[in-house]
Amino acid sequence: MLKSNKVVLIGAGGVGSSFAYALTIDNSLVHELVIIDVNENKAKGEVMDLNHGQMFLKKNINVLFGTYKDCINADIVVITAGLNQKPSETRLDLVDKNSEIFKDIITNVVSSGFDGIFVIASNPVDIMTYVTMKYSKFPIHKVIGTGTILDTSRLRYFLSDRLNVNTQNIHSYIMGEHGDSSFATWDETKIAMKPLSEYLAEGKITEIELDEIHKKVVNAAYEVIKLKGATYYAIGLGIKNIVNAIIGDQNIILPISSYINGQYGGLVKDIYIGAPAIVCKEGVKEVLNFKISPKELEKFNSSANQLKSYIDKIEF
């Protein structure tokens, strides 16, 4: 059960600050946002900057600088802290360093008495979500990662741009790792009620174009990092959607880092990976186990095995 509609953000860098900004301008439910960062001046500066815009908000939110002690009565702790991906680095290159950072963060949060829901956005997010579950010993439904929510948004944007259809009417997901081994669920994709396969049959789009769209999704982060140094606006909006789904008990389906233990063919077990799930006030209500094609199932297993190979090297 929700306690106080209070969210604690750990990490006041580009992603954390973008989430905080998105939450303040589109907030109807959160009463308090506490920001924590190892760089206390950065956190204090973000708090001041956000509070100075209160006059322009539809609903005020109490934004505060805090410490780990403030987690005790929070409903949600959002973690964006950790080292960022550099040009030419993959997200998986960050495993060792960010695992050590997380061990300290999770220990401090749990020691405060926090018993709410973790939302993880730090990369590699699927592995960091698993790390959070292991270090916190929290139930799996109370540990959520952003997963492929950003990848899915990118996919729908690129497909909507190609077909000239609003993104809200495109029903498709990116599944698997939030990274290079992800895949698009093209065989299940629909534009409103019309299967994508009919668009292909009518010659309105080609298989080659779909492959190019998926490549653009996979390479999007590298491109943005090359151009501006980091990605943060879009993922900030994605985190805000997850938080609102929890606080608002929305029962919305989101492609998050979900705990998989036998779904999708039974081969993938004990791992967090991008898959659609129902998100509500309790965290994850259900991981959807919908039917995907054999080709996509093979990609799902391959992506999971890659993540597993990194997780198995971490000492818990």
Curated annotation (Swiss-Prot):
Subunit structure as annotated in this protein's UniProt entry: Homotetramer.
The activity regulation comment is: Allosterically activated by fructose 1,6-bisphosphate (FBP).
Where in this protein does the record say Phosphotyrosine is found? 222
Which GO CC terms are listed, alphabetically? cytoplasm
Q: Which organism is it from?
A: Borrelia garinii subsp. bavariensis (strain ATCC BAA-2496 / DSM 23469 / PBi)
Q: Where does beta-D-fructose 1,6-bisphosphate bind?
A: 156, 171
Keyword list (alphabetical) reads:
Allosteric enzyme, Cytoplasm, NAD, Oxidoreductase, Phosphoprotein
Q: Which residues bind NAD(+)?
A: 15, 37, 42, 68, 82-83, 121-123, 146
Q: Gene3D superfamilies this protein is in?
A: Lactate dehydrogenase/glycoside hydrolase, family 4, C-terminal, NAD(P)-binding Rossmann-like Domain
Involved pathway(s): Fermentation; pyruvate fermentation to lactate; (S)-lactate from pyruvate: step 1/1
Q: Give the similarity note.
A: Belongs to the LDH/MDH superfamily. LDH family.
Query: What's this protein's function?
Result: Catalyzes the conversion of lactate to pyruvate.
Q: Where in the cell is it found?
A: Cytoplasm
Report which gene this protein is encoded by.
ldh
Question: What catalytic activity does the UniProt entry give for this protein?
Answer: (S)-lactate + NAD(+) = pyruvate + NADH + H(+)
The residues listed in the UniProt record as binding substrate, with positions renumbered to this chain, are 85, 91, 123-126, 151-154, 231
> Lineage of the source organism?
Bacteria, Pseudomonadati, Spirochaetota, Spirochaetia, Spirochaetales
**What Enzyme Commission number does this protein have?**
1.1.1.27
| Primary site of residence | cytoplasm
| A GO molecular-function descriptor | L-lactate dehydrogenase activity
GO annotation, biological process: glycolytic process; lactate metabolic process
Q: What is this protein called?
A: L-lactate dehydrogenase
Q: What's one Pfam family the UniProt record gives for this protein?
A: Ldh_1_N
Q: Name the catalytic site residues.
A: 178 (proton acceptor)
